[in-house]
Amino acid sequence: MSRKLARELTMKVLFEMHINNDFNIQRVEHHLFEGSIEEQQKEYIHKVLNEAILNLEAIDSIIEEYSTSWKLNRIANVDLAILRLAFSEIIYMKDIPYRVSINEAIELAKIYGSDETPNFVNGILGKYVEQEGLMLNE
């Protein structure tokens, strides 16, 4: 399994957790690791999910702050899952370049979101990166 597919699976799990309002990683781990997932990708999935769950309030607060005029409960569930994934990577996984996280989030948005989702996701992530000065640290 490639990192791209691992990222997609992680987004789907975050989506499922949100829909079920159950952010207990033990409940999803059993079916997460069925099949042929390489150890490196298992580690990635586990780390992203842990960071997203442990920092859910902080991540959601950032999403609300940068999605001007949009309350969290008005953001489409899939868009929210994509943003939570991307912010988990950008903020807590410094080994992943923020540009990769943004590009991959946009690709997921093109596949799973509405026609507006890629621009919405790009706008929020781009504003965050700019405001936080991450572009200066390249």
Curated annotation (Swiss-Prot):
GO terms for molecular function: RNA binding. Keywords: RNA-binding, Transcription, Transcription antitermination, Transcription regulation. InterPro entries: NusB-like_sf, NusB_fam, NusB_RsmB_TIM44. It holds the Pfam family NusB. Gene3D superfamilies: NusB-like (1.10.940.10). One of its GO terms (biological process) is transcription antitermination. GO terms for cellular component: cytosol. Involved in transcription antitermination. Required for transcription of ribosomal RNA (rRNA) genes. Binds specifically to the boxA antiterminator sequence of the ribosomal RNA (rrn) operons. Belongs to the NusB family. NCBIfam families: nusB. This is Transcription antitermination protein NusB. It comes from Alkaliphilus oremlandii (strain OhILAs) (Clostridium oremlandii (strain OhILAs)). The gene is nusB.
